[in-house]
Amino acid sequence: GSAGFKVVMTSDHGSKMVNRSTMVAADKYSSTGIRYKHGRNINASNKSAVDIRELYSYHLPALGHQTNYLLAKDDYYFLYPNEQRKYKNMLKGSFQHGGISMEEMMVPVLIMDPK
């Protein structure tokens, strides 16, 4: 108020309800994320994931030879073929983060300036 302070409020990014599973092919050294993975030559459907292989273009670290990143699109989540039965129903309808939806990428900011 009268002290002339400007107040800036923000929060962490949000999460996304996931409903569709997609298979990911990866070795045992790949990261374990549900909506984001990195590893050596990991693969998923282009319909369900963004596959980043030109790491320098995105300012991403190369964590080893042939490293790439997968980011889940829309309401997809990643499953390994050998764990499909175990996790598919458990994860469906849950809220996850790490993908590239607007809810996960945008951070709200409110600036209150006294008049």
Feature annotation, model-predicted:
Residues 1-115:
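Feature captures the catalytic ectodomains and active-site-proximal regions of enzymes
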